[in-house]
Amino acid sequence: MIKVGIIGSTGYAGAELARLLLQRDDVEIVWYGSRSYVGEDFASIYRNVAHRVSEPCRDDDMEELSKIADVIFTATPQGFCASKVTEDILSRTKIIDLSADFRMKDVDVYEQWYKITHASPQFIEEAVYGL
């Protein structure tokens, strides 16, 4: 069983990801991360999964999540994942980032495009982009 955490689970991409993962027998979602709905049941926000989910939404603590999840999905705006990821987190878990934080290999292009400073350029070279 693959233990998965989703940071940004109540946004459009995160909720769709949760819906898809809930259909798999080999995945257990152990963390529904949401800044807006901390403490509220995920199923009260998305009624279509009420019969399958009885977990509350938790905060966006990637450090804590990395201690219990095999894989962390971040379905968050640009800048979030890069600002949170550390070498310690990467030594414990895999991260699949749905934003563009590690999509572009050129930090200057990223910073020009998104108008933010990339917080973890040291991880760009080892990141893998998949579509």
Describe each region flagged by the PLM.
Residues M1-L131:
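N-terminal Rossmann-like NAD(P) cofactor-binding subdomain of oxidoreductases
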